[in-house]
Each structure stands twice: as C-alpha cells, then as structure tokens.
C-alpha cells in the first residue's frame, strides 16, 4: 500500500523539528500504525500499571483515564505519556491529527533518544516500554525503506 505523500512530508518535517532522523521516525510510524492516522489501541496492562491508580484515587475521571490507556495516531503515542509530556489539549483523540500526533511523538522519541545516549535501539526499547525485545530490530529493519 503506497504511503500518502502528505503524511510522509509531515513525518519528515516533525522529525526535522526535533532533530531526529526522518527515516527512523517513518519506520516507527510504519511499525506502530502502518501509516493509519486513526489507529488507536487500548493497552490494558499499561492502563492497570500507570493509569488505574490515578482513577482509583480520583485524580482523573473515567473517560480521561481510559483515554490515557490508549495509544493514539500514527506513532501510537500513549495518552498518559502525552499528558506527562505536556499534551494539554482537551481531548487525547487529537493525537490522531497527524500534525499533532507526529509533533508529540517526535518530541517524546527525541527525549528517549537523549536518555539512551543517542542509541536508537535503546531509545526504541524505551519507546515500546521494553516488553518486546524484538521491537527495536523490527523498527530498525524498516529504516532503509525511507532513506
């Protein structure tokens, strides 16, 4: 399936704005959403570990809590992570807006890369939560498609 040229250009610009390798960002997008800006996935284990305590302690309402337990958009940014990194829009579903989701996702990926000392494999493992040891290899194998 061909990639929408507008989405590709948006991804390249978002990567450039954060000083990231555009090919790496595009590979993450392909791995995470297959270039579907409307992709979303409820992550029950993430919800239970990171979000449920906020809801249980009345820090957030039910709708906000469940939205924080969903990965959204092209880069599949977790709602909770987006909130922690300053995404203050009223609705987390705005992460499905390609420009918004890519900007937030690239900012988070840059932070992960900095924390990993510039090592893309370690940054990708952190991006994915470390649960899938093959994730970084799968993404890095896709990078060449975007060079």
Language-model regions, residue ranges each:
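Catalytic glycan-binding domains that act on GlcNAc-containing polysaccharides
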Residues: 1-147
């Amino acid at each position: 399936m061909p990639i929408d040229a507008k989405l590709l250009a948006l991804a390249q610009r978002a990567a450039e704005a954060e000083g990231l390798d555009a090919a790496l960002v595009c590979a993450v997008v392909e791995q995470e959403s297959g270039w579907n800006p409307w992709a979303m996935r409820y992550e029950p284990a993430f919800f239970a570990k990171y979000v449920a305590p906020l809801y249980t302690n009345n820090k957030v309402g039910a709708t906000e809590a469940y939205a924080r337990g969903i990965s959204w958009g092209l880069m599949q940014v977790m709602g909770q992570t987006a909130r922690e990194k300053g995404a203050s829009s009223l609705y987390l579903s705005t992460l499905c807006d390609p420009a918004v989701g890519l900007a937030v996702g690239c900012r988070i990926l840059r932070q992960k890369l900095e924390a990993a000392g510039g090592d893309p494999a370690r940054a990708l493992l952190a991006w994915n939560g470390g649960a899938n040891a093959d994730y970084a290899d799968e993404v890095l194998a896709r990078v060449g498609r975007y060079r």
